[in-house]
A protein has these predicted regions:
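N-terminal nucleotide-binding beta1-loop-alpha1 segment
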Residues: 2, 6-43, 58, 65
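Conserved beta-loop-beta/alpha segment of the NTase-like Rossmann-fold superfamily
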Residues: 97-152
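A short, N-terminal amphipathic alpha-helix
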Residues: 49-70
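Acidic donor-binding segment of Leloir-type glycosyltransferases
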Residues: 77-101
Length: 152
């Protein structure tokens, strides 16, 4: 059953718009052990004020993508949660946005992920209702104009 707000604005369950995003942490091994012994790559600081995860989140927010699934490795994930919090800084804390977190368990030295990683991705893709999904990673430092990529 659709709520009055849903009927009024024409939104359906989780189908805010036709674009969604998967935001992931690094899968595999990177020789940055001195930097990542106690935190994932996504929460590494940059410029004294930012974290690496800020860059893909800002690209998504600037493109108006409001359905985001963040999937992260279980090890030391609390620093990512502490930094993202509600997602308010990127417009992901409103009633019309969706931000989900998935956690998978794998050894840092492994270059593969388990079945639970892909199961969570498939579930999100099926439920998102989006026509197109962009996948971004947190180990590349870049600002991308996704409006140009998707021709929004």
């Amino acid at each position: 059953m659709l709520s009055d707000t849903t009927r009024k604005w024409g939104y359906q369950k989780m189908k805010i718009d036709k674009y969604s995003a998967i935001l992931g942490n690094t899968v595999g091994f990177h020789d940055m052990s001195t930097l990542t012994n106690h935190r994932p790559v996504a929460s590494l600081p940059f410029g004294g004020k930012y974290r690496l995860i800020d860059f893909p989140l800002s690209s998504l927010a600037n493109a108006g993508i409001r359905s985001v699934f963040g999937i992260f490795q279980q090890d030391n994930i609390s620093s990512v949660f502490d930094h993202i919090r509600s997602g308010r800084e990127w417009g992901l804390s409103t009633l019309l946005s969706h931000y989900y977190l998935g956690i998978y368990n794998t050894r840092v030295e492994s270059s593969t992920v388990g079945e639970e990683y892909y199961d969570q991705l498939l579930t999100y893709l099926k439920r998102s209702g989006s026509n197109q999904t962009v996948a971004l990673n947190c180990d590349i430092l870049v600002n991308i104009d996704l409006n140009q990529v998707f021709h929004l």
